[in-house]
């Protein structure tokens, strides 16, 4: 029996049911993990296309397989769109993820054993910025800068001193859990002083940059890497941008054949569609609401009724799409707070805070993000309601108080149906 044209529901109802369950979970609650977003239906349609069938090793016009005329068109559109979106001269859209984009960039511009300098993972950096058990900490000599113990901000004087001490070949500016903007011009000046390459990883804030509500690192960095989901709201994948033709050539070789074989044409098509969406006025409005929503949340969580329970907002606020909640002086630890919000159908993730006394699987913090709610269309008033619900859940004195909060969350979520075309009858 030929199963080529069988639907997923007909052939594999077990997987279909699990996917449907995940759709309903995403729709019925509030998704507030800062690295998650809702991909538009058009993006998912592009990713679920027949392009998944095509091998296309190489680059547009220079493939090692025949029949690539349409794949070439797709990839060239993605390249042209992302260059225009971020004002870059060169772009590689083939990396399968942000991690592989970072790996390819390091492979292109460093030798094994070279020194790199990035933000400590314990202070908000990313594991690919030099964590010892990651490739970046195994292949390279990883050193780190940290945030100040006084204000939890990156101390640029300390970064400069670390650069002079360690003389890195690459300085990495970027983060996975840091609520403020970075000074890209100062990072570049420090990199130039020690003859280092500056790589900016804008995976978390790329959507804000595209919308013009966050400074762009592209004019300052030698190389910029990013994911294409998170605030950018596209499919899971990576990109690499630069303005130097010599660096671009090295990066292209490092991606293919250095790191990857055949590119994922269906994902590149989805990236291209996401880049087109990110150039629309509606996207800029959404990113502003995302930023405003995070600031509304931060403001609510600094109010006396929350602060008196030992709950604080790291740095006192945010410049980006996320809020870092400091629970070191609270009754709840990070795991307990994550579970408390999950009980009212608000999904967040526990996160270490700088100088955290608790183990990484427990933590003393929460990372709460607004991109997914902004994508659903949440207004400023909606974000105020969400902030009140989070504050109420975190300060609840018994589990009986959580049931009514969960009902309020579900009513709020129901006002914004998610992917009605995908619901099975």
From Swiss-Prot:
Q: Identify residues that carry N6-(pyridoxal phosphate)lysine.
A: 230
Q: Which PANTHER family match?
A: SERINE HYDROXYMETHYLTRANSFERASE, SERINE HYDROXYMETHYLTRANSFERASE 1
Question: Where is the protein localized?
Answer: Cytoplasm
Q: Which UniProt keywords apply?
A: Amino-acid biosynthesis, Cytoplasm, One-carbon metabolism, Pyridoxal phosphate, Transferase
Source domain of life is Bacteria
- State the organism named in the record: Mycobacterium bovis (strain ATCC BAA-935 / AF2122/97)
Q: Which cofactor does it need?
A: pyridoxal 5'-phosphate
Annotated catalysed reactions: (6R)-5,10-methylene-5,6,7,8-tetrahydrofolate + glycine + H2O = (6S)-5,6,7,8-tetrahydrofolate + L-serine
HAMAP family, per database record? SHMT (MF_00051)
Q: Which InterPro entries match?
A: PyrdxlP-dep_Trfase, PyrdxlP-dep_Trfase_major, PyrdxlP-dep_Trfase_small, Ser_HO-MeTrfase, Ser_HO-MeTrfase-like, Ser_HO-MeTrfase_PLP_BS, SHMT-like_dom
Please name the taxonomic classification of the source. Answer: Bacteria, Bacillati, Actinomycetota, Actinomycetes, Mycobacteriales
Specify whether Cell membrane is a keyword of the entry. no
**What is the primary gene name for this protein?**
glyA2
Q: Name one GO molecular function term.
A: pyridoxal phosphate binding
Specify which residues bind (6S)-5,6,7,8-tetrahydrofolate according to the UniProt entry for this protein.
121, 125-127
Give the protein name, as stated in the record: Serine hydroxymethyltransferase 2
């Amino acid at each position: 029996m030929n199963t080529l044209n069988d639907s997923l529901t007909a052939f594999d109802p077990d997987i279909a049911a699990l996917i449907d369950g995940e759709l309903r979970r995403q729709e019925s609650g509030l998704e507030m993990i800062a690295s998650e977003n809702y991909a538009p239906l058009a993006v998912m349609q592009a990713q679920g296309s027949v392009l998944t069938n095509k091998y296309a090793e190489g680059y547009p016009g220079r493939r090692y397989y025949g029949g690539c005329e349409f794949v070439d068109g797709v990839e060239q559109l993605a390249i042209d769109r992302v260059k225009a979106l971020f004002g870059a001269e060169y772009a590689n859209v083939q990396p399968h993820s942000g991690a592989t984009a970072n790996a390819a960039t390091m492979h292109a511009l460093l030798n094994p054993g070279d020194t790199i300098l990035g933000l400590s993972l314990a202070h908000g950096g990313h594991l690919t910025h030099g964590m010892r058990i990651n490739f970046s900490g195994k292949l390279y000599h990883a050193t780190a800068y940290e945030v100040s113990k006084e204000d939890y901000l990156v101390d640029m004087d300390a970064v400069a001193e670390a650069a002079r001490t360690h003389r890195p070949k690459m300085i990495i500016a970027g983060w996975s859990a840091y609520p403020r903007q970075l000074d890209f011009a100062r990072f570049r000046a420090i990199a130039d002083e020690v003859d280092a390459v500056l790589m900016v990883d804008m995976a978390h804030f790329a959507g804000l940059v595209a919308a013009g509500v966050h400074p762009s690192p592209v004019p300052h960095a030698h190389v910029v890497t990013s994911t294409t989901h998170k605030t950018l709201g596209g499919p899971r994948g990576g990109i690499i941008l630069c303005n130097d033709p010599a660096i671009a050539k090295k990066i292209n070789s490092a991606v293919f054949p250095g790191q990857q074989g055949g590119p994922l044409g269906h994902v590149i098509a989805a990236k291209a569609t996401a880049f087109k969406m990110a150039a629309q006025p509606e996207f800029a409005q959404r990113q502003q609401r995302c930023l405003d929503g995070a600031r509304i949340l931060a403001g609510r969580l600094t109010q006396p009724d929350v602060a008196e329970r030992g709950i604080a907002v790291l740095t006192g606020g945010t410049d980006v799409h996320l809020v870092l909640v400091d629970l070191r002086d609270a009754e709840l630890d990070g795991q307990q707070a994550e579970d408390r919000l999950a009980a009212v159908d608000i999904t967040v993730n526990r996160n270490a805070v700088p100088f955290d006394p608790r183990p990484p699987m427990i933590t003393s913090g929460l990372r709460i993000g607004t991109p997914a709610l902004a994508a659903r269309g949440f207004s400023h008033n909606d974000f105020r309601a969400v902030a009140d619900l989070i504050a109420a859940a975190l300060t609840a004195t018994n589990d009986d108080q959580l049931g009514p909060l969960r009902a309020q969350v579900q009513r709020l979520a129901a006002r914004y149906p998610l992917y009605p075309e995908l619901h099975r009858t």
